[in-house]
């Protein structure tokens, strides 16, 4: 497997599968990443994204599109902006990259009853629209679930089988009957959600309500709720709690501050309520988390 791109927040690994087809593994724990180093060279490239964990934002032809766990997004690579964002700062997924000009006309000619033609798949999904999103589908989910843990001893052969299986399902997938979900937002709505998220970060140690934030931005509560849910995939209050607990976890790992002090810095004047909130997000108490993860200071 070839490492395509790596930095502290983002890693992409590419595995050649067939001529013109590669399987790219993505892992991210940051806000955004630029895919220029992993960008396809051909103008006629189809990219099939699958999200396993987290959430990804893509700008496709000027529209902001979002994929969540189980979603499948198909688009022509030339329409996708090089920078992708991860609203939850956490993402794991795959891209099947298909260079239509370099792939054989028929990938499965050795199998008489299997007719897989990448050119026809590209036409099926991206001839009328810039992209196509399939919500969590059991058939596709089964195929991708096995792609994430391929044993090294059979990696090359197994990847070929799974990609061929994916292409076969895409070849017969009924795009007319399937519910087509754009999952796209206008830039103004995306900007509002991200501005509110930045406001939350600047006021980490304060307690505030949705109504107060709505007044601060001069919009309705409903507008913020809808924008926030669309961009981040969670509610306004769930995002606040999750982000506070992530920052609290970082402080538990990298500082020797008492738990009660960390709780206060994140808007909790009651350490028991803080511990309960922390456990609901991280699965363990703050004290246990520190014992298991502390890096710079003795327990």
Where are these regions (language model features)?
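Core residues of bacterial helix-turn-helix
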Residues: 216-217, 266-267, 278
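Short, Lys/Arg-enriched, Trp-marked, Pro/Gly-tolerant hinge/linker segments that flank
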Residues: 119-135, 152-158, 167-198, 202, ...
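N-terminal regulatory/effector-sensing and dimerization cores
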Residues: 2-118
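Short hydrophobic/aromatic patch on the recognition helix
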Residues: 224, 228, 273-274, 278
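A long, hydrophobic alpha-helical segment
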Residues: 139-154
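Helix-turn-helix
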Residues: 212-221
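Terminal helix-turn-helix DNA-binding modules in bacterial transcription factors
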Residues: 194-202, 207-212, 230-272, 291-299
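Key DNA-contact positions within bacterial/archaeal DNA-binding proteins
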Residues: 222, 272, 287
